[in-house]
Regions:
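Gly/Pro-rich hinge or "lid" segments in bacterial periplasmic/extracellular proteins
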Residues: 148-212, 216
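A structural "hinge/loop" feature
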Residues: 18-39, 60-62, 86, 150-162, ...
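Structural transition elements
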Residues: 308-344, 360-367
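N-terminal lobe/hinge region of extracytoplasmic solute-binding protein
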Residues: 17-68, 98, 182-183
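Detector for C-terminal structural segments
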Residues: 293-321, 364-373, 395-511
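Surface-exposed binding/hinge segments that line
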Residues: 65, 73-75, 94, 109-165
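Alpha-helical secondary-structure segments
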Residues: 88-98, 138-144, 185-186, 214-216, ...
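Ligand-site clamp/hinge motif
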Residues: 175, 181, 204-250
Length: 511
């Protein structure tokens, strides 16, 4: 009953420390990890993904099922309420999508992730398709998609695109102030000061499957990783999560007062080839570089072993992930690379300009760029000119052909292999690198158009194999999901998975 939830709470309040920043706590205005960390705990989505899984389960909805590849019907749990006692009905669900699309915040996710139910005009204005969301009764929501898209169910797990808000509290045409927000998640917001701290307490009206244990959770925000390291060492915070420097993690492993826990990650780094340039256009050049790269050395020398080598663009832990680059190229082998270039009649050394950005992905990016250059040049087959540019300009000029090759990173929007394939491989990808392959486009349309997961995963494998042969990019590493915690804490390990959802409801403190 409701009474159990309100009197619930096991053990003591605990404190999370992080260097992540929050853009907004109104889901209509955020598309970043710092914001979604709080949103996952304060709001419900229709469906969600349990720890260490990519299987979708109900959250506010009992179920969301495809009637056909363009129709998704969601059945809400009866009697749902927001933390203020208001009933949560299908009307609130519809309103949540309508307002996010109407507000169209530049920092929001709705305009990027809800393409299956929206239309984009030439001037960039996004509107909800007529009849896209129907509510035949208080507990039923039907989505009509404008093309077959089985990834839409995964988008529904992400609060930035699909958190359910109270239509009587959130304005239709502008964002609500952060400290005013109301949700229906396991916790409710009791205090918030941007850049300083958030205070969450148990939501007494929560009836879902993820009832919180701790009566209160505090989130403290730090600007420097070094300050976060000190805070967890001296007990100022109970858990430090995102982001400690690789050297700090290494030294904390030697501190007996804290535990360093790691789970599978999903953040990746990869180098993109420019197929519009005379050099990058040549498949043999791209393949030769792929034959030389030593991922183990990059992980060890540039990142102190705090990341894992990545042998395909889809990381381990995702259905359908393989090790296509390892299968295709085996161990790093400059002699084989020389043969590839010789067979194609390409004279060596090949001169390439390689771009990287110094702050956006952290200080170790420079170490990776230098290691990348060292490996390619020590083969005797490449002459590498490194060029560094700050992020603001970098993301414009890499699309304009400034480099033959450049580094990028990726965090997934939803826990499905498609999110590492379609944005990267269809018609030049979001990074506009000039790669086009008709077979790729056909395969992506096939996997997005079926709900048969075995078939989709088989296609994911084919796409990864094509990527390893064509080499439009070279993946280098996948991050770990790392947290450091003090004495008396339990449950931290169980939330460290590739989704990067920090599930406050799983964590307790005693003593």
């Amino acid at each position: 009953s409701d009474n159990n939830a309100s009197s619930g709470g096991a053990g003591d309040p605990w404190i999370l420390g992080t260097t992540d920043t929050v853009t907004a706590l109104d889901p209509a205005g955020s598309y970043d990890l710092g914001s979604s960390t709080l949103e996952y705990n304060l709001y419900q989505t229709l469906v969600t993904v349990p720890p260490n899984s990519t299987e979708i389960v109900g959250d506010a909805a009992k179920s969301c099922t495809y009637d056909d590849p363009t129709t998704l019907t969601c059945k809400l749990n009866p009697g749902e309420k927001f933390s203020n006692g208001d009933a949560l009905t299908s009307a609130d669900v519809k309103y949540s999508f309508e307002r996010a699309i109407k507000i169209q915040d530049a920092n929001g996710a709705a305009i990027y992730l809800l393409g299956s139910i929206t239309d984009t005009a030439k001037d960039g204005t996004v509107t909800l398709n007529k009849g896209a969301i129907e509510t035949p009764d208080d507990t039923t929501v039907v989505f009509h998609l404008d093309h077959p898209d089985t990834t839409f169910q995964y988008v529904l797990t992400y609060p930035g695109a699909a958190a359910i808000v109270d239509q009587d509290v959130f304005p239709a045409d502008k964002k609500l102030a952060d400290d005013q927000i109301i949700g229906s998640g396991p916790y409710k917001l009791s205090q918030y000061k941007a850049g300083d701290q958030a205070v969450l307490e148990l939501n007494p009206n929560y009836t879902g499957p993820n009832t919180g244990k701790a009566p209160q959770v505090f989130v403290k925000y730090y600007t420097e990783p070094s300050a976060l390291k000190l805070a967890v060492q001296n007990g100022e915070v109970d858990v430090a999560w995102r982001s400690l420097a690789p050297t700090d993690v290494a030294s904390l492993k030697k501190d007996s007062n804290v535990t360093v826990a790691t789970g599978k990650g999903s953040e990746i780094r990869y180098w993109v080839w420019n197929l519009n340039s005379g050099i990058g256009k040549q498949a043999a050049v791209r393949q030769a570089a792929a034959q030389i790269i030593d991922r183990d050395a990059i992980a060890k020398d540039a990142y102190d072993g705090t990341v894992d080598p990545l042998n395909s663009i889809v990381p381990p832990g995702y259905g359908g992930a393989n090790e296509a680059f390892k299968t295709q190229y085996g161990a790093p082998n400059p002699a084989k690379a020389k043969q590839i270039l010789k067979a194609a009649g390409i004279s060596t050394p090949v001169n390439i300009t390689v771009g990287w950005t110094p702050t956006h992905y952290g200080p170790s990016t420079e170490d990776e760029a230098n290691e990348f250059q060292r490996q390619l040049e020590s083969s005797g087959l490449f002459k590498v000119t490194l060029k560094s540019t700050e992020w603001e300009q970098y993301q414009t000029i890499y699309k304009q052909g400034a480099y033959d090759m450049w580094i990028l990173g990726w965090f997934p929007d939803y826990p499905d292999g498609d999110d590492y394939l379609s944005p990267f491989m269809v018609d030049g990808g979001f990074f506009a690198n000039g790669y086009h392959n008709a077979q790729v486009n056909k395969l992506v349309a096939q996997e997005q158009g079926t709900d048969d997961q075995a078939k989709r995963q088989q296609i994911f494998g084919q796409l990864q194999d094509i990527a390893a042969k064509d080499v439009p990019f070279i993946p280098t590493w996948v991050g770990q999901n790392t947290a450091v915690y003090g004495k008396g804490m339990s449950g931290v390990e169980s939330t460290l998975d590739p989704s990067f959802i920090f599930r406050f409801w799983l964590v307790t403190k005693s003593g």
